[in-house]
C-alpha cells in the first residue's frame, strides 16, 4: 500500500503543500512542529 503514496507525493516537493513532506514550507514547518509538540505534551 506504500506505492500509491509515491503517486500522491511528487518528487518536485511542491511549496504549496509543505505538510505533504512535513517540511519545505519554512515558517509553516515550524508552526506544524509546534502543533505536534503541543499534541505530544497533552
UniProtKB/Swiss-Prot annotation:
Concerning its family, UniProt says: Belongs to the attacin/sarcotoxin-2 family.
Q: Where in the cell is it found?
A: Secreted
Q: What biological function has been recorded for the protein in this entry?
A: Antimicrobial peptide active against Gram-negative bacterium E.coli and fungus N.crassa. Has no activity against Gram-positive bacterium M.luteus. Active against E.coli and, weakly, against M.luteus.
Name of the protein described by the UniProt record: Diptericin
Region Disordered, as annotated, extends over 1-31
Asked if the Swiss-Prot or TrEMBL record annotates the protein with the keyword Secreted, the reply is yes
- Tell me which UniProt keywords the record has, alphabetically: Antibiotic, Antimicrobial, Fungicide, Immunity, Innate immunity, Secreted
Organism for this UniProt entry: Calliphora vicina (Blue blowfly)
Q: What else is known?
A: At least four isoforms with masses ranging from 8886.5 kDa to 9029.0 kDa seem to exist.
| GO cellular component assignments | extracellular region
**GO annotation (BP), single:** innate immune response
Q: What triggers its expression?
A: By bacterial infection.
Amino acid at each position: 500500500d506504500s506505492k500509491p503514496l509515491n503517486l500522491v507525493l511528487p518528487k518536485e516537493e511542491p511549496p504549496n503543500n509543505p505538510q505533504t513532506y512535513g517540511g519545505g514550507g519554512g515558517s509553516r514547518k515550524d508552526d506544524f512542529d509546534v502543533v505536534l509538540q503541543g499534541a505530544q505534551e497533552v
